[in-house]
Amino acid sequence: MKIEIKEVIDKREKEKVSKEVLYDLPEWFGLPESTKNYIIDSQDKPLLACYVNDEVAGYIVLNATSKDCADIFVMGVKKKFHRMGIGLKLNNAFEILAKKLGYTYSQVKTVKTGCYKEYDITNKFYIAMGYKELECFPTLWDEWNPSQIYIKYLGE
């Protein structure tokens, strides 16, 4: 099995990768308007895609929230590639890119643990990647989806 991480530059290819992954994950990305926004907004940001035997397996997008902090804007791994280390590889590549671009911190927002089993899996993943809970905003998105913010120090 050949696993490869590549930075995608072309906007049409970014759109294709985003659609292919997010449409495979309706349990996480089931709100059409939000999913559409992730697909459109990802086109102007650094995007890393993971390919398994030349098939898109997952992707991660970097968004700058400040001069010091890179945000995981969106990340997804197709279901058939879950539990194969794809998320770990994408996260590691994201951190390398963030440090190369001068960021010393990374943050990610997700739905707080205890709300939905799918997001409990997501929270466990980020904790396993070394992220720490920073703060929860109960109504940032809406009252049914409290926004948990995680942060990680990447180094100087």
Task: Give the positions of each predicted feature.
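Acetyl-CoA-dependent GNAT
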Residues: 3, 7-73, 78, 91, ...
